[in-house]
């Protein structure tokens, strides 16, 4: 009797592994089936979402600039762009436009060289800017706007005075605007070794007063950087300002004003490695807005002195500037472009917000002030 019982137990024990294997296989089959079903449902859900997604509008275009000057965008994250664009708590409203001025030298009379402007024409330009509702901004404000769409005046102007000048020059041409309107002027400072102690001290005083916001414009006033420039020349022009700005101005420059308008792929990449965040050319292409920079991809036979910058693919390091002598005539154009851009944005607002709600809201959160 005990022998039969033992035999039965042995047979039962032999069947246990088989039962476990069968059970495991069945469980795996169920898991695979469930996983496959979930994947099919996910694909179906994704397809359903994709089919309901509204197509985003193309980049704003305008006929008010040269057709070869094509608006370039630089914000790759669509969700972040839409949130920055429509967050009315902290963001500049669509159509906020910045006119960037390049001033070589203001002459009492008889401006004849490129970049020069007479004192009379300069005063007329500044008064027209103010009467048209423009306000001057500092480089740090411009950087916050152009990178993240942080609020600035809807019509802003960035006034860049190229080259080194003493206090008497700035007092004569800029102090009244600082005193009466609070307008700061950006100075493209050339960090030449032979700058006199007195010139340094005068500019340091104006920097800490707030009237002048110094940024880097290389070392040698005659340098024109390009892709053919030697590594040592590129390094000298870009590193030189970093060596002296901290000691004298108590800051690192945010921007590099390309000396004499010369730039290239290699100089731009080197500037980025040295932590420059903005670059300004001498190319006159139009105003700039958040995620909207007009640049050329090809050489324009009618403007051979404007090297194309679009293919460098770094719009923030190749920003255009209006020449001082042409600024007055362009003010209405800049204002009109801002109005066109605002109207275009409002026409497409609901489409962008619907896209954001479907694609972005779960990860990026609700856009403040929009239910």
Regions found by a protein language model. Name each.
Residues 141-142, 154-183:
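Substrate-binding cleft of extracellular glycoside hydrolase catalytic domains
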Residues 4-16:
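Bacterial N-terminal signal peptides that target proteins for export
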Residues 203-224, 233-240, 245:
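A structural motif
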Residues 29-31:
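Bacterial signal peptide processing site
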Residues 24-27:
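C-terminal motif of bacterial Sec signal peptides marking the signal peptidase cleavage site
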Residues 80, 119-122, 183-194:
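N-terminal pro-sequences and low-complexity stem/linker regions of secreted or lumenal proteins
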């Amino acid at each position: 009797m005990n022998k039969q019982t033992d035999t039965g137990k042995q047979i039962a024990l032999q069947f246990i592994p088989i039962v476990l294997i069968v059970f495991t296989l069945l469980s795996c089959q169920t898991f695979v089936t469930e996983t496959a079903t979930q994947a099919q449902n996910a694909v179906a859900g994704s397809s359903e979402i994709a089919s309901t997604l509204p197509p985003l509008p193309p980049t704003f275009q305008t006929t008010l600039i040269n057709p070869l000057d094509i608006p370039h965008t630089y914000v790759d994250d669509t969700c972040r762009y839409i949130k920055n664009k429509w967050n009315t708590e902290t963001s500049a409203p669509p159509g906020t436009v910045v006119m960037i001025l390049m001033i070589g030298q203001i002459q009492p009379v008889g401006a004849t060289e490129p970049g020069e402007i007479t004192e009379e024409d300069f005063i007329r330009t500044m008064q027209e800017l103010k009467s048209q509702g423009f306000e001057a901004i500092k480089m740090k404000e411009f950087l916050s706007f152009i990178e993240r769409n942080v609020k600035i005046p809807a019509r802003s102007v960035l006034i860049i005075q190229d080259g080194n000048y003493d206090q008497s020059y700035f007092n004569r041409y800029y102090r009244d605007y600082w005193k009466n309107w609070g307008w700061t002027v950006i100075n493209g400072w050339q960090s030449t070794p032979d700058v006199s102690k007195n010139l340094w001290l005068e500019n340091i005083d104006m920097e800490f007063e707030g009237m002048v916001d110094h940024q880097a414009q290389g070392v040698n006033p005659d340098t024109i950087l390009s892709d053919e420039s030697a590594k040592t020349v590129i390094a000298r022009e870009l590193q030189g300002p970093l060596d002296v700005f901290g000691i004298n101005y108590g800051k690192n420059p945010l921007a590099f004003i390309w000396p004499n308008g010369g730039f290239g792929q290699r100089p731009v990449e080197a500037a980025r490695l040295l932590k420059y965040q903005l670059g300004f050319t001498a190319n006159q292409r139009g105003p700039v807005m958040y995620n909207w920079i007009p640049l050329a991809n090809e050489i324009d036979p009618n403007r051979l002195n404007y090297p194309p910058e679009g293919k460098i693919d770094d719009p923030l390091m190749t920003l255009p500037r209006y020449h001082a002598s042409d600024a007055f005539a362009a003010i209405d154009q800049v204002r009109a472009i801002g109005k066109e851009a605002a109207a275009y944005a409002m026409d497409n607002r609901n489409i962008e917000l619907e896209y954001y709600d479907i694609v972005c809201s779960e990860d990026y959160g609700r856009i403040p002030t929009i239910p």
